Amino acid sequence: MKRAHPDYSSSDSELDETVEVEKESADENGNLSSALGSMSPTTSSQILARKRRRGIIEKRRRDRINNSLSELRRLVPSAFEKQGSAKLEKAEILQMTVDHLKMLHTAGGKGYFDAHALAMDYRSLGFRECLAEVARYLSIIEGLDASDPLRVRLVSHLNNYASQREAASGAHAGLGHLPWGSAFGHHPHVAHPLLLPQSGHGNTGTSASPTDPHHQGRLAAAHPEAPALRAPPSGGLGPVLPVVTSASKLSPPLLSSVASLSAFPFSFGSFHLLSPNALSPSAPTQAANLGKPYRPWGTEIGAF
């Protein structure tokens, strides 16, 4: 009699293996039809039901494997970087996962569980993706070939910047949790030296560091017309955005992740500010006089 709720006990597996052995022996002797014909209709229906059940189990097993590989492709940074350009094989995903785990083990087991290290890893990957998109835009939309001076300067600058940021993040990896602004290589409340307003007077060309408070004060006095574009003074940090979450909607693992992320508040000073020279109306006039299309980002690249 057929059971209403079939189980997947060891007896079923043994019976399935016995049936497979009988089929193989029948194939070898050429007596497959006679072997099946000797069974009763009840036994034949049970064999077909078990085969159908085995196919369902095999399909579920393959689905679990594919879902796990998809999660690994999303979680492992090296696999996540390559998934947009080419299709990864299962062996490649597993190899990247093994390499990533070895790297974490070498780093002391802190790398992937460190919120700052995780954010820096994906920030580096995102910057590389943006760099590739800029190169595609220059070649496809702007029509600039690989030997164009503007394209060479821009791509070279972005490559150098990415390499410097990766080297800086690697140097700070052993210092524990750092504020988000340290990922940019300068203090969050101080603007980038290349984006500070340049003065033509000789008193601002001294040997003072761009991050020196007195140097910042002289620059502020030399350019009083752009108060909104200057960063806050070095005595205090800029406005901070706290991470706001609802504890009642998060599971315990997510709560621990949010707690670790709350140690790194975002600061408006971390984002690079534009120089007032970049907003001056003389840039379009100069570009028009040269007979070239106006590219405001092209005029700024020459300073690097």
UniProtKB/Swiss-Prot annotation:
Residues 1-52, 191-234 are annotated as: Disordered. GO terms for molecular function: cis-regulatory region sequence-specific DNA binding; DNA-binding transcription repressor activity, RNA polymerase II-specific; protein dimerization activity; RNA polymerase II-specific DNA-binding transcription factor binding. PROSITE patterns: BHLH, ORANGE. Transmembrane segments: none annotated. The keyword Transcription regulation applies. SMART domains: HLH, ORANGE. It holds the Pfam family HLH. GO terms for cellular component: nucleus. Residues 122-158 form the Orange domain. Residues 218-234 have a biased composition (Low complexity). Transcriptional repressor which binds preferentially to the canonical E box sequence 5'-CACGTG-3'. Downstream effector of Notch signaling required for cardiovascular development. Specifically required for the Notch-induced endocardial epithelial to mesenchymal transition, which is itself criticial for cardiac valve and septum development. May be required in conjunction with HEY2 to specify arterial cell fate or identity. Promotes maintenance of neuronal precursor cells and glial versus neuronal fate specification. Self-associates. Interacts with HES1 and HEYL. Interacts with HDAC1, NCOR1 and SIN3A. Interacts with GATA4 and GATA6. Interacts with CCDC89/BOIP. This is Hairy/enhancer-of-split related with YRPW motif protein 1. The lineage of its organism: Eukaryota, Metazoa, Chordata, Craniata, Vertebrata.
